[in-house]
């Protein structure tokens, strides 16, 4: 553990994720590009991309870990794929997201479901400083634009007094086991290789 603490987590993360690229363009680096991307996708996102719905058992597992009547901070809540079902068993939820378009969709869903225990905040996680006495923090695929990962994870740990869950979608091709059997190469996203190190060094 002592050796792990000496590792410069941010340096490794930034290298693996291309933050040191000479040409900095696209969603990762440009807020306006990112906002336009979500403005277009937001109305259809919940229907097309919903991990809570599509990954069997994930929602139940999170429910089991968080328990009933807890205060949840949802980092990168988006349109509420996880926020909405969690609100039905939580005391209250603070939903933080950088996209106004996605937060509008969240508001529509909350009204449709008759839920009043969710407050939405428009903010990047890096800039978020609002006081909130959370029991747990949930982050689902929401840290991909973070440059300083150590600071982002330490903030999550500070807010989640009882703990936190990070959900990350693995970048593997469909039927990847078949690729392995045939000794075919396929691309992996290196940030998932770094996640265990992040937990060890930051928490």
Residue ranges and their predicted role:
Residues 192-203:
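Short alpha-helix
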Residues 79-126:
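Class I SAM-dependent methyltransferase SAM/SAH-binding core
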Residues 2-66, 69-78, 165-191:
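Conserved class I S-adenosyl-L-methionine
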């Amino acid at each position: 553990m002592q050796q792990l603490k000496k590792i410069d987590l941010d340096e490794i993360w930034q290298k693996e994720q291309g933050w040191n690229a000479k040409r900095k363009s696209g969603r990762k680096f440009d807020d306006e590009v990112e906002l336009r991307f979500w403005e277009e996708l937001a109305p259809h996102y919940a229907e097309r991309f919903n991990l809570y719905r599509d990954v069997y058992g994930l929602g139940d597992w999170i429910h089991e870990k968080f328990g009933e009547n807890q205060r949840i901070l949802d980092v990168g809540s988006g349109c509420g794929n996880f926020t909405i079902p969690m609100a039905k068993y939580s005391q209250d939820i603070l939903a933080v997201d950088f996209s106004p378009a996605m937060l509008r969709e969240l508001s529509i869903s909350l009204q449709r479901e008759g839920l009043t225990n969710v407050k939405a905040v428009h903010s990047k996680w890096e800039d978020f400083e609002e006081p909130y006495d959370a029991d747990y923090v949930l982050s689902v695929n929401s840290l991909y634009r973070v440059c300083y990962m150590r600071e982002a994870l330490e903030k999550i740990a500070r807010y989640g007094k009882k703990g936190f869950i990070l959900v990350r979608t693995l970048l593997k091709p469909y039927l990847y086991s078949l690729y392995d059997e045939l000794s075919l190469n396929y691309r992996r996203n290196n940030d998932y290789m770094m996640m265990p190190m992040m937990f060890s060094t930051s928490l």
